[in-house]
Amino acid sequence: MTTKQYGCVVPPIHLSSTYNFTGFNEPRAHDYSRRGNPTRDVVQRALAELEGGAGAVLTNTGMSAIHLVTTVFLKPGDLLVAPHDCYGGSYRLFDSLAKRGCYRVLFVDQGR
């Protein structure tokens, strides 16, 4: 099923969670929606085009985006500076990963 096949003006939202294989151990472009699906592909391409980027990555929550960025780009010894009153989930994530040696974190009072 493609947008061209049905003449959709707006890309459809694919709600399927699983996809069949073409044969034994021969997956198609998508096999399970948590790894990717046609809807995410369309949105990622659109975001990359809008931002002039080579690609884009979608995550299911803001916290997963923060976790992805900090674990991909920060290495042991790097310093993350964050506001002392940032979202509690972010604070706990930064603090927890810093205690494990993933990077260093400095919480600052931005009012000073």
Indicate residue ranges for each PLM-predicted region:
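Fold-independent oxyanion-binding glycine-rich loops
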Residues: S17-T18, T61-G62, P83-D85, D109-G111
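PLP-dependent aminotransferase-class I/II
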Residues: D95-R112
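Conserved PLP-anchoring active-site segment centered on the Schiff-base-forming lysine
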Residues: V72-S90, D109
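Short, surface-exposed connector motifs at secondary-structure boundaries
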Residues: L50-G53, L74-L79, K99-G101
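Short conserved active-site loop signatures built around small residues
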Residues: M1-I13
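Residue-level signal for pocket-adjacent positions within structured domains
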Residues: V10, P27-H30, Y103
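Conserved N-terminal alpha-helix of the aminotransferase class I/II PLP-enzyme fold
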Residues: T18-H67, T71, G89-S96
